[in-house]
Amino acid sequence: MSTAALVEGKIVQCIGAVIDVEFPRDSMPKIYDALILDGSELTLEVQQQLGDGVVRTICLGASDGLRRGLTVKNTSKPISVPVGKPTLGRIMDVLGRPIDEAGPIESEHTRSIHQKAPAFDELSPSTELLETGIKVIDLICPFAKGGKVGLFGGAGVGKTVNMMELINNIAKEHGGYSVFAGVGERTREGNDFYHEMKDSNVLDKVALVYGQMNEPPGNRLRVLTGLTMAEHFRDEGLDVLFFVDNIYRFTLAGTEVSALLGRMPSAVGYQPTLAEEMGKLQERITSTKKGSITSVQAVYVPADDLTDPSPATTFGHLDATVVLSRDIASLGIYPAVDPLDSTSRQIDPNVIGEEHYSITRRVQQTLQRYKELRDIIAILGMDELSPEDKLSVARARKIQRFLSQPFHVAEVFTGSPGKYVPLKETIRGFKMIVDGECDHLPEQAFYMVGTIDEAFEKAKKIS
């Protein structure tokens, strides 16, 4: 480090996670410069220049014990994290420091967490499908390789379990590198995930970045750390998977420090820069002509309200949205994906083929008809329906149950072994139901099975 890099300043104000530091007027730190507290490893990141040599910073760690007058040194560069193969199989914090007690990360390359998004002419569109082995996703809202997917759901409907199953199915089949960013989620889940990856021997292909629930908001703002690692693999010409759980905590952390940074709150108390912050992040999660980033992001929906500014801002950036519904979860159907609310840009006969497209639309029409008839059934009962409507309702209830599926990651809790269903089998199964080839089977036969053949087997046992 040059001597110019070690300009010293003094803390003049501490309010929660926001710290004001005064420097000599002629050597004020730049926005996003990293400052280090003298005698400790605590890092502050410059957010605003207030003038007269004073900068406002966010503390990336606990601010316990800080007081006015402490010395802070300016590193004169943004926060940089290790990237490349040495990060694989390791757990890192927001600053790229290892937290798995397995020694330092010996990486030759570091990269600033603040990067520009790729230029428009570098982007690469993708129409190649990514099979997940989860029936409802492959049928209703298929993923594109190099696309962005959001898992939307309220508290306790299964976002993390769905995310884990996707990681289990895709990361193991994929064979490439993955980056997992745990942003403000439960430490227990992070620990479970680490051991699961270890047990299935894919840990050496995954880089883990954790900023958990108990950490100050500055840490959760840094979903950028994981993204920077994923971008590096992409720029090396690799196809990488990027998982984020949970993108809402990133927004929430911004909300927590926004008022302390002196900004006026906007709708529902969110930061006024919500759309810009989300845009900056999402535009970087993209595929270029060098390599692809396929990202799956869990998005918490406050009070199950999809029109809340945070999930609503995220919607526009995604290629596929998987909406988890409390009503479906209350029926005991897992994964609790709402087939009428979930969408994908891949649902196009030119992309997924005519057969897949028509089966998807027929399944949705049948379910929509059942939804419309539900009120009539509740008041007058099934007997008042026409024979066609009775048939539609019977098929819809079978479809609804056939959309459920036992998960590998939930095997410990449910006792039933997980099922991976290939796309061809999924299409064949739903085609048989909508064509009326399963009208003679009881609806219980379709609950928690994999392929349609298993439903026939189950029906024999029931009868």
Swiss-Prot record:
It catalyses: ATP + H2O + 4 H(+)(in) = ADP + phosphate + 5 H(+)(out). The keyword Mitochondrion does not apply. GO terms for molecular function: ATP binding; ATP hydrolysis activity; proton-transporting ATP synthase activity, rotational mechanism. It is found in: Cell inner membrane. It is a peripheral membrane protein. Pfam families: ATP-synt_ab, ATP-synt_ab_N, ATP-synt_VA_C. Signal peptide: none annotated. ATP binds at G153, G154, A155, G156, V157, G158, K159, T160. The keyword Thylakoid does not apply. Its main location: membrane. Gene3D superfamilies: 2.40.10.170, Bovine Mitochondrial F1-atpase, Atp Synthase Beta Chain, Chain D, domain 3 (1.10.1140.10), P-loop containing nucleotide triphosphate hydrolases (3.40.50.300). InterPro entries: AAA+_ATPase, ATP-synt_VA_C, ATP_synth_F1_bsu, ATPase_a/bsu_AS, ATPase_alpha/beta_chains, ATPase_F1/V1/A1_a/bsu_N, ATPase_F1/V1/A1_a/bsu_N_sf, ATPase_F1/V1/A1_a/bsu_nucl-bd. It comes from the Bacteria. NCBIfam families: atpD. Produces ATP from ADP in the presence of a proton gradient across the membrane. The catalytic sites are hosted primarily by the beta subunits. F-type ATPases have 2 components, CF(1) - the catalytic core - and CF(0) - the membrane proton channel. CF(1) has five subunits: alpha(3), beta(3), gamma(1), delta(1), epsilon(1). CF(0) has three main subunits: a(1), b(2) and c(9-12). The alpha and beta chains form an alternating ring which encloses part of the gamma chain. CF(1) is attached to CF(0) by a central stalk formed by the gamma and epsilon chains, while a peripheral stalk is formed by the delta and b chains. This is ATP synthase subunit beta. It comes from Burkholderia cepacia (Pseudomonas cepacia). The gene is atpD.
